[in-house]
UniProtKB/Swiss-Prot annotation:
It comes from the Bacteria. This is L-seryl-tRNA(Sec) selenium transferase. SUPFAM superfamilies: PLP-dependent transferases (SSF53383). Keywords: Cytoplasm, Protein biosynthesis, Pyridoxal phosphate, Selenium, Transferase. Pathway: Aminoacyl-tRNA biosynthesis; selenocysteinyl-tRNA(Sec) biosynthesis; selenocysteinyl-tRNA(Sec) from L-seryl-tRNA(Sec) (bacterial route): step 1/1. The keyword Membrane does not apply. It comes from Klebsiella pneumoniae (strain 342). Its main location: cytoplasm. Converts seryl-tRNA(Sec) to selenocysteinyl-tRNA(Sec) required for selenoprotein biosynthesis. It is found in: Cytoplasm. Pfam families: Se-cys_synth_N, SelA. GO terms for molecular function: L-seryl-tRNA(Sec) selenium transferase activity.
Length: 462
């Protein structure tokens, strides 16, 4: 070992000496002795490694207190951090999908602060059912006889199939054997539920006769799956829910539908593309309909099944129901969200998902133009401008439809793509990260989902 390297090692402080320093007292009080010691040991190990490999001390070694404090603070930061979603995808799966309404947030907070009547009947002091209040709301909204709540729509489909068709055949069109994110495939779910998949028709064309010809003594269900994350166009043919329900009634076979996203209002009234609604399926005679709570509905992650009372009872009594049931926070948020649908005249004001989806492009453009001057002055190495863009709904909802929007774009004057990557990384490291997208040599911030512009500017002008 050379004298110089030995000298570097001697400059490393002893942990005991650091802890005796009065300047460390606030850090010890805030984070505790064991966490501070563990962090200092890790820092010492890193410093020794750098001396060994590079014959230098770390940049932070001149101020152990500050470096230790920074690391401990970063380690205490929640893994679920609020961000600015300026990607252009409103229901972004990786960013938590639907933002909750204020009434839903308050309901969750209330449910967490005290015991609640989750499974307790106040009228007779007996055991109640956790789905009951929400089931009543869903029946009012959809016209169904009963409802069942689980923790997501994949679970809803699994439970629906396991409780009504295990060991038997389920007839589905080949054009509806969907796969969604995370490799969730309808055939795989059927296999897990113990069902036998019976494909009918072709990828682009399925007729009523295909379903009729497929039915046999082992047929348990006829199933419709809404292809919410892709579209087949051109020479196509599909059997709609009403026609399939009529076949089911004729042959005395239940018809079930997986809507995926599921919207409880006609989106076309807001100028958005129409999406199939559970109440339409129920009116058409479908026996069970499943859909998500955290997509177009705008609530928490949940799987919702509405339909015939006798079939819902089979779902409620199935062993999987307990494994898949929703907790009190989910139920509180979902109930509060569903109550908003009882007042459709103010839905676009109170439900964040619908508010963001219906936001006029001209309003978004005015916002971009208002923010442009300060940002252009601050980011002198970039050409900052306002550009028209297209938002998407996201989470597999209406995959081919786009919403006119406006974005702030950042183009490096020197044309180097590495500058865009560095800028995006810098924004992701902010206390409230700003998440955009890089495309066509520019960093885009689609402002459709930006509502707190004051906080946003505080972040970008740091």
């Amino acid at each position: 070992m050379t004298t110089d390297i030995r000298a570097l090692y001697t400059r490393l402080p002893a942990i005991d000496r650091l802890l005796r320093d009065p300047a460390f007292s606030p850090l010890l009080a805030q984070h505790g002795h064991s966490q501070v010691v563990a962090q200092l040991r890790q820092m010492l190990d890193e410093a020794r490694e750098q001396i060994s490999q590079r014959q230098t001390l770390p940049d932070w070694s001149h101020d152990w207190l500050h470096a230790c404090e920074q690391r401990l603070t970063a380690g205490q930061r929640s893994a679920l951090r609020p961000v600015f979603n300026l990607t252009g995808t409103v229901l972004h799966t990786n960013l938590g999908r639907a933002i909750q309404a204020e009434s839903a947030v308050e309901a969750v907070a209330s449910a967490m602060r005290a015991p609640v009547t989750l499974e307790y009947d106040l009228d007779d002091a007996g055991r109640g059912h956790r789905d009951r209040a929400i089931a009543d709301l869903l029946c009012q909204i959809t016209g169904a006889e009963d409802a069942c709540i689980v923790n997501n729509n994949a679970a809803a489909v699994l439970l629906m199939l396991a409780a009504t068709a295990s060991g038997r055949e389920v007839v589905v069109s080949r054009g509806e054997l969907v796969e969604i994110g995370g490799a969730f495939r309808i055939p795989d779910v059927m296999r897990q539920a113990g069902c036998q998949l019976h494909e009918v028709g072709t990828t682009n064309r399925t007729h009523a006769k295909d379903y009729r010809q497929a039915v046999n003594d082992n047929t348990a269900l006829l199933m419709k799956v809404h292809t919410s994350n892709y579209s087949i166009e051109g020479f196509t043919k599909a059997v709609d829910e009403a026609e399939l329900a009529a076949i089911g009634r004729e042959l005395d076979i239940p018809v079930v539908a997986d809507l995926g996203s599921g919207s409880l209002v006609d989106l076309s009234q807001y100028g958005l593309p129409k999406e199939p609604m559970p109440q339409e399926m129920i009116a058409a005679g479908v026996s069970l309909v499943s859909f998500s709570g955290d997509k177009l509905l705008g609530g928490p992650q949940a799987g919702i099944i509405v339909g015939k009372r006798a079939l819902i009872a089979r779902l409620q009594s199935h062993p999987l129901k307990r494994a898949l049931r929703a907790d009190k926070m989910t139920l509180a948020a979902l109930e509060a969200t569903l109550r908003l649908y009882q007042h459709p005249e103010v839905l676009t004001e109170r439900l964040p998902t619908l508010r963001l989806l219906t936001r006029p492009a001209e309003e978004i453009r005015r916002l971009a133009e208002r923010l442009l001057p300060d940002l252009a002055a601050h980011y002198a190495d970039f050409a900052v401008s306002v550009a028209a863009c297209q938002s998407q709904i996201g989470s597999g909802s209406l995959p081919v439809d786009r919403l006119p929007s406006a974005a702030l774009t950042f183009t490096p004057h020197d044309g180097r793509g590495s500058r865009l990557e560095a800028l995006a990384a810098r924004w992701r490291a902010l206390p409230c990260p700003v998440i955009g997208r890089i495309d066509d040599g520019r960093l885009w911030l689609d402002l459709r989902c930006l509502e707190d512009e004051t906080r946003f500017m505080e972040m970008l002008l740091r």
